[in-house]
């Protein structure tokens, strides 16, 4: 699957492992939540970065003690109608201050890309290369937003207030 990271098509250094797949000695891996929680100590001690595939029906609080040690949290969109991963993303960014890669996986669709960015996602697994190119272009399309969200960008109101303040400071 193509990966869009930071608004660009990127190589994915992570290998997805199933619950019963033998652990490689090194390299970056993505493991399912149940495997990570069951083998956290061993996984965190091995060479290479660790990422966790977190289902949207599992409490994100279970992952909080490990956030400083995890390079990637891949949140799953099992259906385009199921938006629980948006809530998980905002919690990770805003409440738990997670600064690692937040990846959207599963049913990642073009028309939801901007909303995913606003929720705090910075990487996206897409089904087709054409979608990856379209996603990369979407990053450039929107620069100002009205609602505050998990991506850390200033809202239109805050930008306007900063501009007025800087103009007033020069008098």
Explain the meaning of each model-derived region:
Residues 99-110:
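Glycine-rich beta-to-alpha transition loops that act as phosphate-gripper elements at the mouths
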Residues 52, 61-65, 110-123:
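Catalytic cores of alpha/beta
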Residues 35, 56-58, 79, 108, ...:
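Active-site-proximal loop/turn and secondary-structure-junction residues that shape catalytic pockets
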Residues 35-42, 80-92, 132-141:
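Active-site-adjacent beta->alpha loops and helix N-cap segments on the catalytic face
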Residues 110-111, 124, 128-171:
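Alpha/beta catalytic cores of nucleotide-metabolism and tRNA/nucleoside-modifying enzymes
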Residues 49-92:
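Glycine/Thr-rich beta-alpha phosphate-binding loop at enzyme active sites
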Residues 28-30, 49-51, 72-74, 101-103, ...:
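Structural preference for beta-strand elements that scaffold enzyme active sites
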Residues 11-58:
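A positional/architectural concept
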């Amino acid at each position: 699957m193509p990966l869009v990271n930071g608004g660009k098509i990127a190589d994915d250094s992570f290998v997805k492992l199933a619950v019963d797949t033998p652990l490689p000695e090194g390299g970056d891996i993505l493991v399912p939540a149940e495997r990570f929680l069951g083998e956290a100590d061993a996984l965190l001690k091995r060479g290479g970065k660790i990422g966790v595939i977190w289902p949207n029906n599992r409490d994100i609080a279970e992952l909080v003690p490990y956030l400083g040690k995890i390079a990637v949290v891949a949140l799953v969109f099992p259906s385009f109608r199921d938006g629980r991963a948006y809530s998980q993303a905002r919690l990770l960014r805003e409440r738990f201050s997670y600064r690692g890669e937040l990846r959207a996986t599963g049913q990642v669709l073009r028309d939801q890309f901007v909303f995913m960015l606003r929720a705090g996602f910075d990487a996206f697994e897409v089904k087709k290369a054409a979608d990856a190119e379209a996603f990369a272009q979407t990053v450039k399309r929107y620069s100002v937003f009205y609602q505050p969200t998990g991506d850390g960008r200033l809202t239109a109101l805050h930008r306007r207030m900063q501009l007025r303040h800087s103009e007033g400071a020069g008098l």
